[in-house]
Amino acid sequence: MKTDSIFYNIFQEFPFVFFALLGIPADATNQYQFTSQKIKQLAFRLDGLFLPIVEDAQLPFYIVEVQFQPDPNLYYRLFAELFIYLKQYQPPHPWQLVVIYPNRQTERENSLHFQEMLELPKITRIYLNELSTPETGSLPIKLLKLVIEPENTASDLAVDLARQAQTEISDTTVRESFINLLETIIVYKLPQKTREEVAAMFSLSDLKQTR
């Protein structure tokens, strides 16, 4: 599974995680649907879209890009896709672009062409390694940081997150899905292990049974 697919799975299943990144209250998730949309002229899809599902012209729609490899052409592509999307669909909402990086070293700004655009309030660049994680209310941020956690400490963080989920997520179905997602991330980080081995190694199965 590719890194961007993991993030899109997270946003699909737990959209409050995305809004936590932006410092927006979790109840904003009730106003949005996470989806993808095809751009016909270029035969590609925007895989990360948060589209408003309520009639409020002030609500922005969000284009989300996850970039874990240096790409000098990224902003050329992103802005081309954005403006072609605007021309083709003419959405009734203002746009916001959110780009998620593991760290600043991965970004290629191309400041000659894009410096002024990247400084617009419409564009948010997030560097996961710089996110702070307070002791309380930090479950969404910790979940995303698990993706960049070193292999030798990822298992401990996964177990901590599973235990934190027991306390903070009251809905049993949501909690089960959250722990399954933790397992998926760890299997991605430790591809030599099966999901069953990961669950056994980190006692995630035991955590499930004790809920």
Go through each PLM region and give its residues.
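Elongated, amphipathic alpha-helical interaction scaffolds
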Residues: 1-211
